[in-house]
C-alpha cells in the first residue's frame, strides 16, 4: 500500500499497524461483493460478542425495540435515525433482520456500528425484562385510545422504550397489550400508516424533544 496517495492514503494512516490492508482494481472489488455497487472500500471483521440487554441499557433513557422488523433496508434506516435523533440503544427480536447484514449496514451509513444494540432473549417476556430495568414501554400502534406522541404523560417518564412492529402487520396484539402506553402519529389525507422506518424517525424525534 506504499503507492497509495490522496484520500486513500489519509484513510490508511488511521489504521493500526496490525490491520492488513490490500488494494485491488474495481473489478476485483465487484467480484468480492457480488454486485456492482461499491464505494471503493471493503472491510472484513469478526463479529463482536453481543452484550446483554441489561448491559446495553445501562444509563440509557430512550431506547427503540424492533419486533420482527424483517427488511434490511428498514433496519438500516431505523439505525440511522436512532443515531441522528439521540436514541441510546436498539433492541431487536431474534426473528427480525440482522443489523450487520450488508444492506442494513450500508443503508444505516455505518450507524449500526455506532448505536449500541443487541437481541432480546427468546423464551421470556421482554416487556417484563424492560420493566425490571425501569423502562416504561410505548407501543406505536393505531388504536382509538392511542395517545399523541407529545402527550405530557410521556414527558414525565424518565425511561422510555419505543416499540415498533413488523412491516405490514405491525405489532402483535399481545405486545400492544403488554405495553404501558400506546401512541400514534397524527396523519392527514386519509393516510392510515407510515413505513416503519419513516414512523421511527418521527417517533425518535419526538422522544428526543421529550428527552430535552
Regions found by a protein language model. Name each.
Residues 41-43, 81-85, 96-112, 173-212:
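Structured adenosyl-cofactor binding patch, chiefly the S-adenosyl-L-methionine
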Residues 34-60, 96:
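Acidic/glycine-rich phosphate/pyrophosphate-binding loops and surrounding catalytic core
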Residues 138-191:
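Active-site/ligand-binding-proximal alpha/beta "capping" segment
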Residues 88-136:
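Histidine/lysine/aspartate-rich catalytic loop segments that bind and position anionic ligands
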Residues 60-99:
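Internal active-site segments that recognize and position negatively charged phosphoryl groups
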Residues 1-36, 136:
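N-terminal positively charged helical leader segments and presequences
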Residues 24-25, 67, 93-94, 116, ...:
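Short beta->alpha connector loops at strand-helix junctions that form conserved
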Residues 54-57, 125-133, 149-156:
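Short amphipathic alpha-helix with an adjacent loop that forms part of the alpha/beta core around
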Amino acid at each position: 500500500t506504499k503507492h497509495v496517495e490522496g484520500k486513500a492514503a489519509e484513510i490508511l494512516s488511521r489504521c493500526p499497524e496490525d490491520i492488513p490492508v490490500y488494494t485491488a482494481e474495481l473489478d476485483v472489488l465487484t467480484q468480492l461483493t457480488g454486485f456492482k455497487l461499491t464505494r471503493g472500500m471493503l472491510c472484513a471483521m469478526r463479529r463482536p460478542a453481543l452484550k446483554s440487554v441489561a448491559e446495553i441499557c445501562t444509563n440509557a433513557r430512550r431506547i427503540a425495540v424492533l419486533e420482527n422488523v424483517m427488511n434490511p433496508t428498514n433496519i438500516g434506516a431505523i439505525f440511522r435515525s436512532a443515531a441522528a435523533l439521540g436514541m441510546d440503544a436498539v433492541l431487536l427480536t431474534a426473528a427480525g433482520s440482522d443489523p450487520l447484514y450488508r444492506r442494513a449496514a450500508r443503508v444505516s451509513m455505518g450507524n449500526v456500528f455506532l448505536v449500541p444494540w443487541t437481541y432480546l432473549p427468546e423464551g421470556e417476556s421482554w416487556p417484563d425484562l424492560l420493566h425490571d430495568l425501569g423502562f416504561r414501554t410505548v407501543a406505536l400502534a393505531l388504536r382509538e385510545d392511542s395517545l399523541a406522541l407529545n402527550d405530557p404523560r410521556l414527558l414525565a417518564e424518565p425511561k422510555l422504550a419505543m416499540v415498533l412492529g413488523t412491516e405490514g402487520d405491525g405489532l402483535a396484539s399481545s405486545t400492544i397489550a403488554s405495553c404501558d402506553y400506546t401512541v400514534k402519529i397524527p396523519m392527514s389525507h386519509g393516510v392510515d400508516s407510515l413505513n416503519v422506518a419513516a414512523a421511527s424517525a418521527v417517533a425518535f424525534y419526538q422522544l428526543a424533544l421529550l428527552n430535552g
